[in-house]
């Protein structure tokens, strides 16, 4: 029988509920339990696929093609288990499901209301498909007190009474701010947050309290008294140097032990923390450092590149180096010479994006990497622009561009109108909806025997996650290959380019997919490991 852990947040947003949920799942996993993580988002969008990166941050894509919250990336990286479309739901998706049922007449003429229909739909999502797991951890997005979150909180309140005894606990993540003028950590914000939670019928079993310094025992006892939790269930969650330090820190604070105690599990399995001890040791015993430039479009919000940042760090771990990232807004290179910004970096990475803004600046960065023999990795949009760069500067194709930017006689990159998914032809009209209409999820690619990328992978058939609406136009393949560009990866049907490289460049690779989505701290993606290895070599030349 599955047990349920609901993680809520209070006081302020962005406290790290996703990291807390992923950490707790990893700790339970270390004790031999089977865990599943789910995220419930209160916004009305059906999914984050059409949301601005500045509003939402990264859109994390699962193998089955779901566009989900970035916290699912943390879930995968901490547990090693792949998420799917049933691990993230939004208010928009819930309402869409309910309205579809109402139109079909499934409610038999009943007045459709938030209670019971919306709450029942939420409960159905939470409790479905959990037969193979010991613990289901559900993170409730937003902050307690937000009007959007009320149906979710009501649903998890109801589940406490509907499921067997000792099947549900609540973990509340909160903040204990330090007031420098008086030199004290303050408990009052947490007290009020818990009071708000209790007013809707939920009493937290465990308080996970964020703080930037150790919490005195007197303040813990105060929280215990006023928030109605055991003193041992007030767990301090101190700021850590990296997110991969968090599991060991929470374990030492007794979070996993307290959770098992709340469920009445005794005796508890002994945890095997070897791999977390190893990863924290390696993080703090690096032997050098390199610097790479990420030339992007959304550099003002690092959450837009969350998986990319982590994958770069994983590549650094694999090479025992710290990787410093120089964030460069691509539009800068449309006004200034990129050389002054890029001549001292050891690698250049152009990540995925949409739209024309910043594209010309990225092309300038790609040209610099190609001509100066600087290690280069282009992801999705980055690969497309690398093809436009060679078309313009070597093949001399007039007006070479992308149909995403403008009408052009030479669309090196064009809109995909059809592609194969699991042997089924999917089609898209140019004037169709944007949401959920891209090439999404895991697709196979065939790598050219003997190519650089095939050697990196150690195989010629790979399965990687995609999220794109445009694709390099295969009609220009021969002309670009005559200029030295190698199409080293193609879709199995030979229609869609998946990877490019140069034979005469020490490390220049572009891929249409998103390798960062499958990188793990314990299993770094081979492309990032190899890319950072190349930057280490480059650092010896600069």
From Swiss-Prot:
Name the Gene3D superfamilies for this protein. Answer: 3.40.50.880, P-loop containing nucleotide triphosphate hydrolases
Q: What InterPro entries does this protein's entry cite?
A: Class_I_gatase-like (IPR029062), CTP_synthase (IPR004468), CTP_synthase_N (IPR017456), GATASE (IPR017926), GATase1_CTP_Synthase (IPR033828), P-loop_NTPase (IPR027417)
Location of the region described as Amidoligase domain in the Swiss-Prot/TrEMBL record = 1-265
Q: Which SUPFAM superfamilies match?
A: Class I glutamine amidotransferase-like (SSF52317), P-loop containing nucleoside triphosphate hydrolases (SSF52540)
GO terms classed as biological process: 'de novo' CTP biosynthetic process; pyrimidine nucleobase biosynthetic process
Catalytic activity, reaction form? UTP + L-glutamine + ATP + H2O = CTP + L-glutamate + ADP + phosphate + 2 H(+); L-glutamine + H2O = L-glutamate + NH4(+); UTP + NH4(+) + ATP = CTP + ADP + phosphate + 2 H(+)
Q: Where does ATP bind?
A: 14-19, 71
Which pairs are disulfide-linked? none
Pathway info: Pyrimidine metabolism; CTP biosynthesis via de novo pathway; CTP from UDP: step 2/2
Q: How is its activity regulated?
A: Allosterically activated by GTP, when glutamine is the substrate; GTP has no effect on the reaction when ammonia is the substrate. The allosteric effector GTP functions by stabilizing the protein conformation that binds the tetrahedral intermediate(s) formed during glutamine hydrolysis. Inhibited by the product CTP, via allosteric rather than competitive inhibition.
Any single GO molecular-function term of the entry would be:
CTP synthase activity
| E.C. numbers | 6.3.4.2
Q: Which UniProt keywords apply?
A: ATP-binding, Glutamine amidotransferase, Ligase, Magnesium, Metal-binding, Nucleotide-binding, Pyrimidine biosynthesis
Annotated Mg(2+) binding sites = 71, 139
Q: Which family does it belong to?
A: Belongs to the CTP synthase family.
> What else is on record for this protein?
CTPSs have evolved a hybrid strategy for distinguishing between UTP and CTP. The overlapping regions of the product feedback inhibitory and substrate sites recognize a common feature in both compounds, the triphosphate moiety. To differentiate isosteric substrate and product pyrimidine rings, an additional pocket far from the expected kinase/ligase catalytic site, specifically recognizes the cytosine and ribose portions of the product inhibitor.
Role summary: Catalyzes the ATP-dependent amination of UTP to CTP with either L-glutamine or ammonia as the source of nitrogen. Regulates intracellular CTP levels through interactions with the four ribonucleotide triphosphates.
**What protein name is recorded for this chain?**
CTP synthase
- Organism, as annotated: Bartonella quintana (strain Toulouse)
Lineage at the top is: Bacteria, Pseudomonadati, Pseudomonadota, Alphaproteobacteria, Hyphomicrobiales
Primary gene name: pyrG
